[in-house]
Structure formats: structure tokens, C-alpha cells
Swiss-Prot record:
Protein's name according to its UniProt entry: 5'-nucleotidase SurE
Similarity annotation: Belongs to the SurE nucleotidase family.
Pfam family, one: SurE
Compartments it resides in: Cytoplasm
UniProt catalytic activity: a ribonucleoside 5'-phosphate + H2O = a ribonucleoside + phosphate
Broad enzyme group: hydrolase
Role: Nucleotidase that shows phosphatase activity on nucleoside 5'-monophosphates.
Domain of life: Bacteria
Cofactor remark from the record: Binds 1 divalent metal cation per subunit.
Gene responsible for this protein: surE
GO cellular component: cytoplasm
């Protein structure tokens, strides 16, 4: 397959380099990724300044382009302007740390995959689910095997797979689980500090809230050393609430 690879940790990050080299064993890989880290940029795109593309070498077999933009920018630019062949799959990652629960709302990694989905390409976001000890090799090996097993062309439109791989050796993975997005989120707070000139600034911290009791969630799967595979959708309408809201606001109309 012709695969476009991006990330939000930056084109020099180990995760994307390990991923690109592993995928290049069986596929044609084009890397288009931010020139610096763009973590937690969400689905931002650049519309007021130009985008620059600098060719770089990623591993031994892969051509890459460093972009002064976001992951979503990279996917747009890669598909529409840089690639001289048809992109068949977008892969975003390997992210350093998990993208579970509400992480996906902020994640540049997940947004890169969702941008691919919006552009009607099968898309995957993949994360090594440990900030302190990410097992990029495990995640890369898993994805290469997964692509041999799963036909990405069967994915419905505007859908991406959010994959979180536990931070263990490949032999220790118990398998995979198709999961739902958990309610894992954060209780945020800000610490007020002063710079050397006496000016106030704020540094954000967050405590993880894991109050989702279900065993079918992304977090529950990763906790038990299963790879979590969650189908996510580009459109965010709450279909379950629509009938009730319609009745309350429109009545019989």
C-alpha cells in the first residue's frame, strides 16, 4: 500500500522513525510531519501563514517532509500537494503516551488520522500507551501485522481507528480488543508562578480521572495488556439525544 505517515511529536521523534522504517518493509511510505513537536494541537490547521516543506531522510528507505504546521496540515498537504501517487492509507503516530478517553479531543495524533478520514482515506492513529517507557517497536510490529490481517478498504467513510498499544514486549501482548472510547479525563488545575522579571505566568497540571467501570473501554483493554482498537468518527452529533431534544424543543412540529 501507499501509506502517508504523520505524527504530532515531530518528524525527528523516535516513534515516527521506527514506524516508518517498519512499514517500509512491506509498503511504500511517505512521511509528512511537523518540523517540531505539535502535541495537543487538536485539529488546528494553518490558514494565515504559508506552509514550508523541507525534504529530510527518515530511516534508510523513506523520504520525509518536515512541515511548519500541524498534523492536520501535514495530512492535507501530503495528500493534495506532495504525494505524486494515490495515498491508500493515512497512519498517524507512533505517539509517545496514550490517547484514551478525552485525550482524543486534544490529540494532534488522532486529529491527523481524522483529517485523513475527512479526506476519505482509511486512517489509523497509533499510540504507545506509556509516557515514561513507550514501546515503539512493539507498536510498530503490531501495526505491520495488523495491516496483514485487516483490510483497511472495508472501513466506513469518515472513520478512523484509534489504536493504543500497551507498553510491553510484543510477546506479552494478549491480543486486541475492539473498544469504545472511555470516560477517562482530567481534573485540571493551574499553578501560578513568577518569571525572573516578576511577571505572573501559569502552568497547567492535571489529575487523571478514571471512573469508567466498563470492561469494554479503551482504558480497560490497555490496562489488561490488550491492544485497544476504537473506531472513531469525524462527525460528532449525539444521535441518542437527538429524539429527546427534538421533542423538547420542537414538540409535535
Amino acid at each position: 500500500m501507499n501509506i502517508l505517515v504523520t505524527n504530532d511529536d515531530g518528524i525527528m521523534a523516535p516513534g515516527i522513525n521506527i514506524l516508518a522504517q517498519k512499514l517500509a518493509e512491506k509498503h511504500s511510505v511517505l512521511v509528512v510531519a511537523p518540523d517540531v513537536e505539535r502535541s495537543a494541537t487538536g485539529h488546528a490547521i494553518t490558514i494565515r501563514t504559508p506552509l514550508w516543506a523541507k525534504e529530510v531522510k527518515v530511516g534508510e528507505k523513506t523520504v520525509g517532509y518536515a512541515i511548519n504546521g500541524t498534523p492536520a496540515d501535514c495530512v492535507k498537504l501530503g495528500i493534495l500537494a506532495i504525494a505524486d501517487f494515490e495515498i491508500e492509507l493515512v497512519v498517524s503516530g507512533i505517539n509517545k503516551g496514550p490517547n484514551l478517553g478525552t485525550d482524543i479531543l486534544y490529540s494532534g495524533t488522532v486529529s491527523g488520522a481524522l483529517e485523513g478520514a475527512v479526506m476519505e482515506k482509511p486512517s489509523i492513529a497509533i499510540s504507545a500507551a506509556d509516557w515514561n517507557n513507550p514501546k515503539y517497536e512493539t507498536a510498530a510490529e503490531f501495526l505491520l501485522e495488523f495491516l496483514d490481517t485487516y483490510d483497511v478498504t472495508k472501513m466506513p467513510e469518515f472513520t478512523a481507528l484509534n489504536i493504543n498499544v500497551p507498553s510491553v514486549d510484543r510477546a506479552e501482548l494478549k491480543g486486541w480488543k475492539v473498544t469504545r472510547q472511555s470516560r477517562r479525563r482530567y481534573r485540571d488545575y493551574f499553578e501560578k508562578r513568577k518569571d525572573p522579571y516578576g511577571n505572573n505566568y501559569y502552568w497547567m497540571f492535571g489529575e487523571i480521572i478514571e471512573d469508567d467501570p466498563g470492561e469494554d473501554s479503551d482504558y480497560a483493554a490497555v490496562r489488561r495488556n490488550y491492544v485497544s482498537i476504537t473506531p472513531i468518527y469525524a462527525f460528532m452529533t449525539n444521535q441518542n439525544y437527538m429524539p429527546k431534544l427534538k421533542e423538547e424543543l420542537e414538540g409535535g412540529n
